[in-house]
Structures are given as C-alpha cells and as structure tokens.
C-alpha cells in the first residue's frame, strides 16, 4: 500500500488489513427522502404520502433547539404535551412562522383531536390500519414458524430413514450371525486385534 501511495495509484483494498481511516457510513441512505416531509430540510422533494395518511407522531420533529421550540409554544419533543390550546391567540398579533413551523403547527385534517393537546392519540382510521398490519404481520410470522417447524420435522424424519438400515440388511446380518462360518481347524474363534 505504501508503494501504491508513492506511485500515485489508488491501493486495492486487501482483506485482513485495516484501512488508514474508517469510511463513514452514508447516513443519507438510512433516511430516504420519502421519510422526510420535505419542508423541514431544504433541498428535499416533498414526500409522496399525503399528511392526512400519517398520524401526528410520524411528522418531522422541529429542527430548532428545545428552548427555542418551547418559547414558540411548540412541543419539547414530538408527540409531547402542549401548554396552550390550538386556535388564534386573542391577546396579540401572530408571530411569523417559517414554513417548517407552519407545517408542524398545521393540524392533520383526518385527526384534529390528535394535535389538540394532551397526549398524542392516533386517528381512529390509523389505529385500525396499524392493528390490521399488526394482525397480518403476526399471521405471517405464525405461518413462517409453522413452515419452519414442518420443514424441520421432514428433515428429521428423512435423517431417521436415511440412517435406518433396510430390512434386507437386517435379515442378512441376522442370517450371517446365526450361520457358522467355515473355519480352518487351527484358526482361532475370534481374531485378535
């Protein structure tokens, strides 16, 4: 590798040798743009899923520090308590909000009670969908477990059949054990080891 560095060519990675520096994992691959709402991070396209299909807990969290978010009246963390009720504030003018904060402050049409205050509750339709998904996943897991158990039993029985001698071999061994073999008169009954 040192010679390749001197020659200016890129060294080929060799298994078993440590690299000079660890390569950072591209975290962008873990968070595709479809997961982000598109308003919180500039440069990302808007998500293909409509906000009405997502419960409030799946919306993007505010990117501002918690103290700034608390000063704006937002949640300290996603899905947390709200200190003030929703609606226009009668005591003064509304503060101007960035598009991301407007997105976080806007109620989801299918679940207005989910954002109204108090602990976050998913919309009834979303809860039913999640329960259906959980049931389907549980049924799939049970079917997979049953298939694996059946496959294990089949393999175990095949192994037993494979190791079990055939009936012809059993009869041959029986007859050969019962029949006296012809021996020389001076040969011992049993051969020494």
From Swiss-Prot:
Chief site of localization: mitochondrion
GO BP annotation list: apoptotic process; apoptotic signaling pathway; cellular response to hypoxia; cellular response to ionizing radiation; determination of adult lifespan; DNA damage response; execution phase of apoptosis; fibroblast apoptotic process
Annotated keywords: Apoptosis, Mitochondrion, Phosphoprotein
Region called Disordered, residue ranges: 1-32, 71-131
Molecular functions per Gene Ontology: ATPase binding
GO CC annotations on file: lysosome; mitochondrion
Motif BH3, residue numbers: 137-151
Positions of post-translational Phosphoserine modification: 10
Stored InterPro entries: Bbc3
Protein localization: Mitochondrion
Induction: By DNA damage, glucocorticoid treatment, growth factor deprivation and p53.
Role played: Essential mediator of p53/TP53-dependent and p53/TP53-independent apoptosis. Promotes partial unfolding of BCL2L1 and dissociation of BCL2L1 from p53/TP53, releasing the bound p53/TP53 to induce apoptosis. Regulates ER stress-induced neuronal apoptosis.
Subunit (UniProt): Interacts with MCL1 and BCL2A1. Interacts (via BH3 domain) with BCL2 and BCL2L1/BCL-XL. Interacts (via BH3 domain) with NOL3/ARC (via CARD domain); this interaction prevents BBC3 association with BCL2 and results in CASP8 activation.
Family: Belongs to the Bcl-2 family.
Domain notes: The BH3 motif is intrinsically disordered in the absence of a binding partner but folds upon binding. Folds when bound to BCL2L1. Also folds when bound to MCL1.
Name of the protein described by the UniProt record: Bcl-2-binding component 3
Gene: Bbc3
